[in-house]
Amino acid sequence: MGTWARALLGSTLLSLLLAAAPGALGTNPGLITRITDKGLEYAAREGLLALQRKLLEVTLPDSDGDFRIKHFGRAQYKFYSLKIPRFELLRGTLRPLPGQGLSLDISDAYIHVRGSWKVRKAFLRLKNSFDLYVKGLTISVHLVLGSESSGRPTVTTSSCSSDIQNVELDIEGDLEELLNLLQSQIDARLREVLESKICRQIEEAVTAHLQPYLQTLPVTTQIDSFAGIDYSLMEAPRATAGMLDVMFKGEIFPLDHRSPVDFLAPAMNLPEAHSRMVYFSISDYVFNTASLAYHKSGYWNFSITDAMVPADLNIRRTTKSFRPFVPLLANLYPNMNLELQGTVNSEQLVNLSTENLLEEPEMDIEALVVLPSSAREPVFRLGVATNVSATLTLNTRKITGFLKPGRLQVELKESKVGGFNVELLEALLNYYILNNLYPKVNEKLAHRFPLPLLRHIQLYDLLLQTHENFLLVGANIQYRRV
């Protein structure tokens, strides 16, 4: 990333904002990122540091001309070897412009210009050096944030202005009248050049550095081998007094086949929180599209194998071993193997409340006898229900989860082999689910839900709250230079 990407928007925060692609009109976002006044203050501080380095690259052209010297007539002068050894930006603010974008306002900037001068008049040859000090420089830049039809972010400069309040010149030489004439020429020429060069440098940097950098942000991010997440913008960022809200689609989808979901994201009523630089409001829509994506991919389907049952229980997937559970099974299908196939009935809806993240999964477990012909014949089907709560944790870039299951409740839905001991089978399934299925799911949750951040951004002072229909993540931000 170029220094300008950090300079103008303090890309530490802009990286939170933009991953474009327009959404459907009238729908709610799945994720909202809110940049607070504290976040904008941090962006301004980071931006000033980087902008100082960028403006030190401003090149000043040589300048020549002629002027009249009393008693000597007209003479030629030239200013050359102009350098900027110091460029200090002392104060700056980054504020939202409602309905437009962002404004970067810099005041009390200071520039030191060092150069040489020479004067020629027939036989007269004079030359020496000078130092020019610009004080009270102000710079104002307005940026428009948006997205293009491809779904990627855009940033343009709508206006830029700079103004020099005071110039002091320290010029070396002996002829006072000549030096006074030179001073007026240097003051006028360099004031004009500096004011135009500063804005030109800024505008070129937006086009050449910041915009290409934003274009590298992917619209989608792969979570794992099964699913990805759509971080497209649903509209241009909303600038209001003291904050900037960015609306992301926030939809998780299966990688092998994406299709529209048949439910909408709920409206989120964000609290008026300002203790952190940035807040992520993640609606239950995000979690429910994740459940749907993994259901469509078949990730929730499972098989109970002999290796999953403790050896000391002496229970294997045979009709003989299942005699304690289903007495008639071994009589009707003597000495045959069993297959136990589990499926989640449908995508599971996650309910976010002020207390917790809750889910109520329902599963079917079907038993099939493997006949001597290798054909499979279904013999009974069980319904399994439970309550699941999730513990969520944060790190510098992602959210992780851990499921805490409740006890299973098993019912017999269908049987071709008569009745059986549901309580005993329920105990066996509780052991299996607790020791095999949930660890598998928790392993997947450990892969983490990535937040919409660009590279080199880290979060700290993390805050996690659950609200009705959404999860609120607050954080401060640090840009780690590389």
From Swiss-Prot:
Biological process terms in GO annotation: acute-phase response; cellular defense response; defense response to Gram-negative bacterium; defense response to Gram-positive bacterium; innate immune response; lipid transport; lipopolysaccharide-mediated signaling pathway; macrophage activation involved in immune response
Q: Which GO terms describe its cellular component?
A: extracellular space
Q: Which UniProt keywords apply?
A: Antibiotic, Antimicrobial, Disulfide bond, Glycoprotein, Immunity, Innate immunity, Lipid transport, Secreted, Signal, Transport
Q: Which GO terms describe its molecular function?
A: lipopolysaccharide binding; signaling receptor binding
Tissues where the protein occurs: Detected in blood plasma (at protein level).
Tell me the disulfide pairings in this chain.
C160-C199
InterPro entries named in the record: Bactericidal_perm-incr_a/b_dom, BPI/LBP, BPI/LBP/Plunc, Lipid-bd_serum_glycop_C, Lipid-bd_serum_glycop_CS, Lipid-bd_serum_glycop_N
Pfam family of the protein (one): LBP_BPI_CETP
Localization terms from the record: Secreted
Annotated signal sequence is 1-26
> Its function?
Plays a role in the innate immune response. Binds to the lipid A moiety of bacterial lipopolysaccharides (LPS), a glycolipid present in the outer membrane of all Gram-negative bacteria. Acts as an affinity enhancer for CD14, facilitating its association with LPS. Promotes the release of cytokines in response to bacterial lipopolysaccharide.
- Name under which the protein is recorded: Lipopolysaccharide-binding protein
Q: What is the lineage of its organism?
A: Eukaryota, Metazoa, Chordata, Craniata, Vertebrata
